Every structure is written in structure tokens, then in C-alpha cells.
UniProtKB/Swiss-Prot annotation:
Name recorded for this polypeptide: Elongation factor Tu
GO cellular component: cytoplasm
Matching InterPro entries: EF-Tu_GTP-bd, EF-Tu_GTPase, EFTu-like_2, EFTU_2, G_TR_CS, P-loop_NTPase, Small_GTP-bd, T_Tr_GTP-bd_dom
Species of origin: Chloroherpeton thalassium (strain ATCC 35110 / GB-78)
Region annotation (G4) ranges: 136-139
Amino acid sequence: MAKESYKREKPHVNIGTIGHVDHGKTTLTAAITKVLSEKGQAQKMDFDEIDKAPEEKERGITISTSHVEYETPSRHYAHIDCPGHADYVKNMITGAAQMDGAILVVAATDGPMPQTREHILLAKQVNVPSIVVFMNKVDIADPELIELVEMELRELLSSYGFPGDDIPIIQGSALGALNGEAEWVGKIEELMEAVDNYIPTPVRDVDKPFLMPVEDVFSISGRGTVGTGRIERGVIKINEEVELVGIRPTKKSVVTGIEMFRKLLDQGEAGDNAGLLLRGVNKDELERGMVIAKPGSITPHTKFKAEVYILKKEEGGRHTPFFNGYRPQFYFRTTDVTGSVNLPDGVEMVMPGDNLSIEAELIAPIAMDEGLRFAIREGGRTVGAGTVTSIIE
């Protein structure tokens, strides 16, 4: 019996390998599982198993991603690795695999390459909080070059708003570690220590301010109006004050009942599908697409900047480019809102398969904060995906 008290849940952290093609992301992922499996902290996965990533659909977009799990003495990790550059772009923009931190893999033989830059920029845009660097292939690189690459990397990271001078850069050889060479195995252990210590533990959804997107609205005669949906974050208790945000003017209310699977509860929390009974709200004051949230925690907006990915024709996207003033629907949480797209200076048109920064203006306000994901749709068909990077008004 006494054993039970030691069973503490380790904090869970989502990470991924990012970086230029052929710099060793997948080899590193395989090396991490091999080194940790020898301590009983992972299931060893070979390069080929990780490389043939299964396809998944997220917001109508097909993405190939490999998921690997492992643990260190202090944490449990879910690690993603993507086979192709486009999969990374799609993954980061759709938030299909939310990353709490990333391991940037850079080959010492090449230094930073175009996709290295693009992945750092994307990580910044979509709010990946921190990066640890693994400089790979140092066993076959010129020692003087290694020093230059490290300086260049620190400058590059700083130029995109990451703390380049403080970021841990571990020099190693993923292949050497995979082959069991002691010197390089030690570097994988050093990398995991850096990831443990440098990437902050994320705030759990339950600990964030309460928010539930409204999926459906019912009225119960004599009792009031019920909004149903899946609680996205936080905890709600009976008699707590909430705000109804988005589409219409913001309105305050009090939750007088919480129902889940036809049972009455005294509280609901992140992940629960619940119905909230709201005091003093008419059925026509609440609709799908609004959110019920902790007062003051989120505000409605119509103008924002976003990083978007536009699907290729083969992915079911548009067959033709679009131009400034393009008016699709933006699908936020549970509903579509029409909006217009303003392209950056110097961009004449956007081709299927492109990713870029845009400004958008919606015809109705939506509850939003930075990092909110959305789909871009035309007549119910997904043609792109995006992340809100900043709010204009």
C-alpha cells in the first residue's frame, strides 16, 4: 500500500525536431529513442520506422507526422518528426502537433540553410516558446567551421527574437550515437538534459482561464438558456460569472447549472463536453461561434495578422492563385466568418502551396488571442490554414 504515494505523474511536454532537409532530424529522433531505451525510458525506434510517417488529417489538411514517446527522470515527452519540409510548415501552422519546445537540428557541415531560417521564423510566428539546438555531424566537420556555425546560429536565432546567446547548443553526431559510440551517446544525454532544463514546463489547459466555444444553444422553459460545447481550457464552477464573447456585443452572465452526459455537476474542466445553464440570457443572445469565458480573459476582434498555409491543388485546395482583397470564410473554433485578405507589400498573388503572412479583416468580431488557429474555407471546403500572430483591432 505504501508504494502508491510515490506514483507521481511526470509533467508532459510536447516537442519536435525541426531544421533543414538531410541535416539529421530523423536520425537524431532515432538516436534519442535508442539511447533512452537502454535506460528503460523509451521504446527504441529505427530510422525507417520513424521515416515512414503515417498521414493524418487536421482541419482538412493531410500531414505526415511521426510520433515518438520517451521519458527522462523528470518528464514525459511526446516527440514529433516530419518527413518533408511541407509537412513541418503545415504542422506548425495548423497546430496539429502543438509544440512546447523544439530541437533545431543543424548540420555543422552546412550551417544554417534556407529551411533552417524558415523553421525558426515559423517557430516564432506560431509561438513555439523555446528552442534547443543540436549541431549534428560534428564528427565530419572542420573544427574551425564548427565555431563559425555556432556564432552564425546564435545571431540567426537572435534576429528572429529568440535569446540566441542563452540557447543551449549541443555539438554531436546523431549517427555516431545510433551506432553506439560512447562519445556521441554522451552528447544525446547532454541534449536531453538541456531539453529538460531549458524548455519550460507548459501550463496545463486546466490551469488557464476558462473558455468554452459554443457549439449549440438550447432553451429550457422556465430555466433559461444552455450553451453546449467542449471546454477548451480552465475550470468552471456553479455560480461563477462568465462573459459571452464574439459576433454580438459582449454580455455578462452567471452559470447556474453544469450538465454533462445528462448528469448535473458542480464543475466542468478542460476536455469535458458540457452544457452550461446561463442566467438572464435569451436564446437569441447566444449562438454557435461565440465563446463562454472567464470575464476579461479574451476579447472580440475583427482585424489581425496571421501566418497562413494555402493548400496545393493535389491536397484538395484551390486550382488557381488568389489576389489582394480575396474574401474566403475563416473558420474559428466552431463557425465560419467571412473576411477579406490583405497581402503584404510586394506580393501580387498567392499560389496554391504557398505559406505567407497576411492581414485579415472579418465582417463580425470573433473572440481571439495570439496563437489561435483557424481554417480558410470556400463554401465549406478547406483551402488553407492559419495562426493568428498579432491582433490589430
